[in-house]
Amino acid sequence: MKHLSLLALAAVAPTTALAGVIDHQQVTFEKPPTHNQIEKFLIQLGPGESRWVTEEEKWALKLVGFYVLEGMNFFDITAESDQGFSVKSFEQTKVTYPSEIKYQKELAPLSKDLSKGNMRENLVKFTSFHTRYYKSETGVQSATWLLERVQQAIDDSGASKHGVKVEKFNHPWGQFSIIATIPGRSNKTVVVGAHQDSINLFLPSILAAPGADDDGSGTVTILEAFRVLLQSDAIREGKAANTVEFHWYSAEEAGLLGSQAIFSEYSKTGRDVKAMLQQDMTGYVEGTLRAGEVESVGVITDFVDPGLTEFIKLVIKGYCDIPFVLTKCGYACSDHASASRYGYPSAFVIESEFKRSNQKIHTTSDTIELLSFDHMLQHAKMTLGLAYELAFAEL
């Protein structure tokens, strides 16, 4: 696998370009050289570690980051440079989470309503778009279809009369993000997220990118949890203590662009986000099983909020039928990092230990046939449990 990946990398990224990406250096927010008129992007590879790269170098870095140097991810912070500012070091919001789960009785009938069939049907359609690349026409089409599915869940539950709504969050690149809001008795907000875009790193604007696992699986997992959560009268009618939002982000693959835009806006407007859970890749278990290990979900432990992560462990123990394994994914590895960047407590649960996760992502081979909907059901149970428990928690 690693040899094949290196050959593929060589096909899309010249050695000199790749070397430039890997040779990290700190830079100031100066404009990039313009003598050759090649568009440049400012990426952040770690705290205080940024550099200008071409788009080709961005994709080369993602290939290297996943296949060779695990955890080598980045934020694209070009917009900050264009606007002449940088994100300050936000003080992390301190939240005390419950020490136990309390709503097993209320959640038992709801959990039984979670449907593998719904997730499969939605994922079949979602992966039928040629690509969900954030700059593509089909990326807009897939987002439009997803928006309609979220609205259908609201309509079917009759929740709109109680103020439940879904809205576009527009971006300059075409594909929009999606935010569904279930109002509670306060503006304290619990966020569940997944990213809707996909990418084929070899030729992003041309080749197919079904993105079944990355992150079609997370997209339909939280969609199903959202649908079932609205079956709760108390949640639907706004009786929970806190507001709950479900987010489907655009342009995660390009440097967490969609989620950065949303949490930047939330920070500017003083939104009180008490917790954010990211679901990115929820369906692949073959790597774990081939290694002779027990099927489990992967709880990320680096660059996350420790208190929220501890509570998620309680949720998994209480609502899932499989255990968790602790694992790491590195800096800026998914959209939870954007929440954390702006001071909001965040966490991330993935399909397995990171080294056992799907190696077919970002290619034409990231297809449904590789996924387990039984495993995705476990992620849906966890998502539903977390959303319900924190909706009623005193945060």
Curated annotation (Swiss-Prot):
GO MF entries: aminopeptidase activity; metal ion binding; metalloexopeptidase activity
Q: What keywords appear on the UniProt entry?
A: Aminopeptidase, Disulfide bond, Glycoprotein, Hydrolase, Metal-binding, Protease, Secreted, Signal, Zinc, Zymogen
Q: Where in the cell is it found?
A: Secreted
Q: List the disulfide bonds.
A: 329-333
**Binding positions (Zn(2+) 1):** 195, 214, 280
Q: Name one GO cellular component term.
A: extracellular region
Sites carrying sugar chains: 187
As to how many cofactors bind and how, the note says: Binds 2 Zn(2+) ions per subunit.
Show the propeptide residue ranges.
20-95
CDD domains, alphabetically?
Answer: M28_AAP
Q: Which family is annotated?
A: Belongs to the peptidase M28 family. M28E subfamily.
What is this protein identified as?
Leucine aminopeptidase 1
Q: Which organism is it from?
A: Uncinocarpus reesii (strain UAMH 1704)
| Name of encoding gene | LAP1
